[in-house]
Design a protein with these regions (language model features):
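Aromatic- and glycine-enriched glycan-recognition loops and surfaces
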Residues: 18-38, 61-91, 144-145, 210-214, ...
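A glycine-rich, often tryptophan-bearing local segment used as a flexible ligand/cofactor-contacting loop or short
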Residues: 466-542, 568, 602, 608, ...
């Protein structure tokens, strides 16, 4: 039997923020028809319990036994009234259920449901949700109330539910129900935050297990009414820090049909991540469940105005190009002020609908895998005191250089935040460098570190910081021994899965390290790496900017050290002090494979500073370690993703043009000309672009084929047919 996710999904929530009951005055058949034919969606969310002030998530827009109706819906059942029309036009109907925001009055009626902080106060008392309201605990009797609501929702004939929450908030939960459950498991009281206490780490696991257990039982409530029913929630994205709200996408994926996370565009000071939608989608895809990337098309917190057309399209095309589905927050109120503001989205979704078969049943073609580790996000706190020193920004203005105070941060919570910020930059840095250089790569997760999974790749990247178990390290070692290649940097793999130091001979040896003597004095600026030979696009004696943090280590025998650190300088505008004998890069042949190790956090440095020499190092190292199946000659702002269509054998190559006007939000996308793509594949007989269906002119030399794309505007798909 076909499933909801067998075809690409174009989800939308059509909202009435000022008055939810306006839906009962609509012509429901015309509304469903408009959404299908004009908006081109095939899956809609409809509000079952609103997320509205002052926390009215306990009120329903439909008849539900034992539940109070939302004002305006006393004589109107929104779900039972609308579902026949949605299904008539081929739209699957999912119900939005608010599970995190409740009024103080409702909480007073259920005094043992609220989440309690370590200080003994309800979370909502200290941190009112959206300025007014509180939240409930997944281990309290509220869970049974929630499951009854889900069952009542599914009885209406809808196709599934989306749960907006629950959320286990920071410093929660210390309620009596959590205390009892924790004590049953660990025979101890719940500790307060203390990163040196192993029991605190158990509490982090307990919170995530509690969230997963709630979702498991919620799924049972859905399928108990409709075995084909769908359930999912906001699973959290790739950014470190998800432990604060007990969100770990892979753990939750076991009990939901989709993995969804938000990639909303918000204007803010500073640099925006150009690949926000792409990173979110690839991360969610790694959970093993269909990815859904969510965005609204309003101008950030200005909900009554539209995002620029270019940003709308960029979000959609990055998500689709990376193999994901899309969710869009739609609303009547924006259209009333600007009826044409949504036209770019209509055009884009119409294009996707017209070419639906091209985006179906795709398996990524990837030579490289990069680890995004939730273990690291949870537990990594470096043992290096140098990471916690205030170095300032290094900026020079008005004859003053900002060199910071030089003081070392002692507070462990602040240290944890620093390490999360560094890890965020590492992920963004490696991802950006790979995408800009058209490397075909997957994100993989901790659970994927097995020889069976890794054997599908030529190169594995451990970005700067990685907390790994002995078993995971042994699998990586086997991967390299049997011919795989490893890129590792800084403290990758030097901590176990709970963040405890693991500077063992086995781990250091794989990286080519004999011993770590310490770290260079941290400094922002005026410290360098020097090339010892012509390699990776550098000439001998070329200088490369050294990041603030770098390790002083000794290499084992029979390794190559083509780049060395220069001796450190105390401040800027000083003469160079010669070359140290500490390697900056180690190349270690191990079994039939090879390891390239950077003794500095290259991903973090490129992610934060965008200095081109470090992008060059990453680019050339990947080429040095493996031969790409697909080669692309295009500007770095063109993102390329490749797939094999399982049902047809076709090769599908998607190109996303991120070439904008050097500011965000983007207001124009500049067309790119003369893109060349080559690959080794003698099974391809022909090809075309879906923009015009005109046949490609393919040249062949042996098994290698090459073709050109004359002009790329915002998005293009190449379809290569098999013989």
């Amino acid at each position: 039997m076909s499933q909801l996710w067998d075809r690409p999904l174009r989800m939308m929530r059509w909202d009435y923020m000022d008055d939810f009951s306006r839906i009962k005055h609509e012509n429901l058949e015309s509304l469903a028809k408009m959404k299908k034919e004009k908006l081109h969606i095939n899956c809609e969310w409809i509000v079952g319990t609103p997320g509205a002030a002052p926390g009215l998530g306990y009120l329903t827009t439909f008849q539900a036994e034992g539940f109070e109706r939302y004002p305006g819906f006393e004589d109107f059942d929104s779900l039972r009234s609308y579902v026949p029309y949605a299904h008539q036009y081929g739209i699957k109907l999912l119900v939005y259920l608010n599970m995190h925001w409740f009024s103080y009055d409702f909480a007073k009626a259920h005094p043992d449901w609220e989440q309690i902080t370590s200080g003994g106060d309800p979370y909502g008392k200290i941190h009112p949700l959206y300025g007014n309201g509180t939240t409930f605990c997944v281990n309290s009797p509220w869970r049974d109330w929630a499951f009854r609501l889900i069952e009542e929702t599914m009885k209406t004939g809808v196709d599934g539910v989306f749960l907006d929450g629950p959320v286990i908030y920071p410093d929660c939960c210390y309620c009596s129900h959590c205390q009892e459950k924790f004590k049953d498991r660990y025979s101890r009281e719940i500790p307060k935050e203390d990163w040196q206490d192993p029991l605190w780490k158990e509490f982090i696991e307990f919170r995530e297990d509690s969230m997963a257990h709630f979702l498991h039982d919620a799924q049972n409530a859905v399928v108990g009414i409709n075995p084909e029913g769908v359930i999912f929630l906001n699973a959290g994205s790739w950014q470190p820090g998800g432990w604060r709200v007990a969100r770990e996408a892979k753990r939750l994926a076991r009990y939901q049909n989709f993995s969804l996370a938000e990639a909303f565009f918000h204007p803010f000071p500073g640099r925006h991540n150009l690949y926000a939608s792409a990173m979110t989608t690839k991360y969610l895809r790694a959970t093993g469940k269909p990815a859904v990337t969510a965005f609204h098309y309003c101008m950030g917190p200005w909900h009554y105005t539209f995002l620029t057309p270019q940003e709308m399209k960029l979000s959609v095309f990055q998500a689709v190009g990376c193999g994901g589905n899309i969710w869009i927050g739609g609303a009547t109120y924006r259209h009333e002020f600007n009826p044409g503001g949504c036209s770019p989205l209509h055009e884009t979704l119409g294009f996707l609908e017209a070419n639906d078969d091209v985006f179906t049943d795709l398996r990524p073609i990837a030579d490289t895998a990069i680890l995004f580790s939730s273990q690291t996000s949870r537990y990594y706190i470096s043992n290096l005191p140098e990471l916690y020193r205030d170095l300032g920004s290094g900026r020079e203005q008005d004859l003053i250089v900002d060199l910071g105070t030089g003081r070392t941060i002692i507070d462990w919570s602040k240290r944890k935040q620093i390490c999360e910020n560094l890890t965020t930059s590492a992920y963004e840095g490696y991802f950006t460098a790979l995408a800009r250089n058209h490397v075909m790569f997957d994100i993989i997760l901790d659970e994927d570190l097995s020889l069976e999974k890794l054997s599908g790749y030529e190169v594995l990247i451990l970005p700067d910081f990685a907390c790994l178990s002995d078993k995971q390290w042994e699998e990586i070692e086997s991967f390299v021994r049997e011919g795989g290649s490893l890129v590792a940097s800084f403290e990758s793999g030097l901590y176990d899965e709970r963040g405890n130091p693991r500077f063992t001979e086995q781990r250091l040896g794989l990286l080519g390290i004999k011993e770590i003597e310490g770290a260079f004095p941290p400094a922002r600026g005026e410290n360098y790496i020097i090339a010892q030979e012509d390699l990776w696009g550098f000439k001998k004696n070329n200088l490369i900017e050294r990041p603030p943090y770098a390790l002083q280590l000794r290499e084992i025998e029979n390794t190559a050290t083509p780049f060395l650190f220069m001796n450190p300088l105390e401040r800027v505008y000083m003469p160079l002090q010669g070359v140290s004998d500490y390697p900056a890069v180690i190349i270690n042949n191990f079994g039939r494979g090879r390891v390239v190790y950077f003794a500095f956090p290259i991903g973090t440095f490129y992610g934060s500073e965008r200095i081109p020499t470090h992008e060059q190092l990453i680019k050339y190292v990947i080429g040095y370690l493996g031969t790409p199946r697909i080669e692309v000659c295009a500007p770095p702002s063109v993102e390329v993703e490749a797939y094999r269509q399982e049902s047809t054998g076709r090769i599908i190559i998607q190109l996303i043009n991120n070439t904008g006007d050097m500011q965000r939000p983007l207001t124009c996308i500049n067309p790119v000309s003369n893109i060349e793509i080559s690959m080794e594949n003698d099974s391809i007989k022909s090809g075309y672009l879906i923009s015009d269906k005109a046949p490609l002119c393919i040249s062949r030399q042996g098994e290698k084929l090459t073709f050109n794309i004359e002009v790329l505007r915002d998005f293009e798909v190449v379809v290569l047919e098999s013989k």
